[in-house]
Every structure is written in C-alpha cells, then in structure tokens.
C-alpha cells in the first residue's frame, strides 16, 4: 500500500567520545525504504519489494552502533578519502611524496584507520529532485593532513530514493590543493534477504578487470575473456 514519502530521524547511539549518532529512515512511499546513520554514512538497511511484493532487507549490517565502531568491517560505509589500497601507504604528487596512515599491513586501505567510514557526518534531508521521492545529504570536511593526505577536502554525498524504486548515490568533493580522491560505497548485498547468496546471477558489462598482486594491490587492467571474471552475460 502506498504512503506519503517521508524521512524520519532518531538517535542511534553515542560514540566513545560522547557524540550522538543519528539514524535517518527514508521511505519513498511506494515500498522502498532505506536506513542510514551519520557515523560513516553507513547504510544499515535497504528494504526492497521483489516481483511478488515481498519486502526484504537486502544489505548486510549490524544491529548496534558498537559493532560498527569496534569491529569496523566497512559494512555500508562511505569509503574515502581513497577507496581500495595504496601500495606502501605512500604516493607522489607534483614532485612531493606523502606518507599515509598504514592500516592494512604495509598499505593504506580505504583512507587509513580513520578514513571517512569512521567519521561522523553531518546529515540533513534536502528537497528531492524531479523523479526523486526523498533525499538525504551528508557532509564531511577532511582537514589537510588528515591520515596524511594533502589538501582540505569538502565532501557532499547524497542518498536519494526515486519514485521508480531506485536508490541513487551522488558524490561531490572540492579541495583547496591537489590531492587524491576516490570515493565509493561499501555495502554488501544479498537480494534474497537472508541465507546463501549462491543462487544469485551476476551480470557486469565490463570487458576488463583490475588484476591484483600480493597484498591485493592493483597491477594492471586485464581482459576478462577466458577468466573467472567474465560476467558479460549473467553467471551464477
């Protein structure tokens, strides 16, 4: 049954330093609902109706804030300032070498131990654009030198639910100095809602993939043909 689109806000818990984390419940009024918390911009719930109208939460997550803070498996976070790994936790930009926080052996993963997925974001409902039912904007300012990255980076991330049962993420970032930026979302999906995901079929219209070496460091782009990574047609 259809209802009016809405966004509700409630307290979700407190961080060890006493700051309050809020949870935002987005409802497009047509059966699609999303839950996001201001800690890490984590999407901890996405309820989607299937073709028969049965609704299930299709993302993996915890029930309590402490699990996200203490265990930090990157479930549902905004990954940054640089998602994935940087070899040796170091890079050179405009002739200068920058040493980053190393939190994955000798490498930097998802921006370091205090990456964007561990930060408290400022969140607020914003007017929906045409085709959207509801929208939430999250803001975070990463100071110059945070986790070793140069430049002050102002980030806006927008979660919106469409009138067509779509969920869209929009990223914007502005820096005052040359820096590295690679933002993404880090949810894990099980479209069955629970149990095994081995019954899924996956289709990715990509002809190349990033080949990785020791430490899962990307080495080069390789052709998917003849590899287990060829999902150009749907595969289990």
Please give the residue ranges for each predicted region:
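An exposed, glycine/acidic-rich loop-and-rim segment of catalytic or binding clefts
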Residues: 2-236
């Amino acid at each position: 049954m259809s209802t009016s689109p809405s966004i509700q806000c409630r307290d979700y818990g407190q961080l060890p330093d006493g700051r309050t984390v809020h949870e935002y419940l987005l409802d497009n009024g047509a059966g699609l609902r999303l839950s996001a918390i201001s800690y890490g911009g984590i999407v901890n719930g996405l309820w989607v109706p299937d073709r028969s109208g049965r609704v299930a939460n299709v993302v993996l997550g915890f029930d309590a804030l402490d699990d996200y803070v203490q265990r930090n498996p990157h479930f549902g976070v905004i990954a940054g300032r640089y998602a994935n790994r940087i070899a040796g936790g170091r890079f050179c930009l405009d002739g200068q070498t920058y040493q980053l926080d190393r939190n994955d052996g000798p490498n930097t993963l998802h921006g370091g131990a205090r990456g964007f997925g561990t930060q408290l974001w400022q969140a607020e409902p914003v007017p929906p654009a045409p085709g959207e039912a509801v929208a939430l904007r999250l803001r975070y300012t990463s100071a110059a030198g945070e986790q070793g990255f140069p430049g002050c980076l102002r980030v806006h991330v927008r979660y919106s639910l469409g009138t067509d049962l779509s969920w869209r993420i929009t990223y914007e970032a502005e820096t005052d100095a040359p820096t590295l930026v690679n933002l993404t979302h880090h949810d894990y999906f099980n479209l069955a809602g629970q149990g095994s995901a081995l019954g899924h079929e996956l289709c990715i219209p990509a002809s190349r993939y990033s080949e990785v070496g020791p430490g899962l460091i990307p080495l080069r782009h390789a052709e998917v043909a003849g590899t287990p990574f060829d999902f150009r047609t749907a595969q289990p």
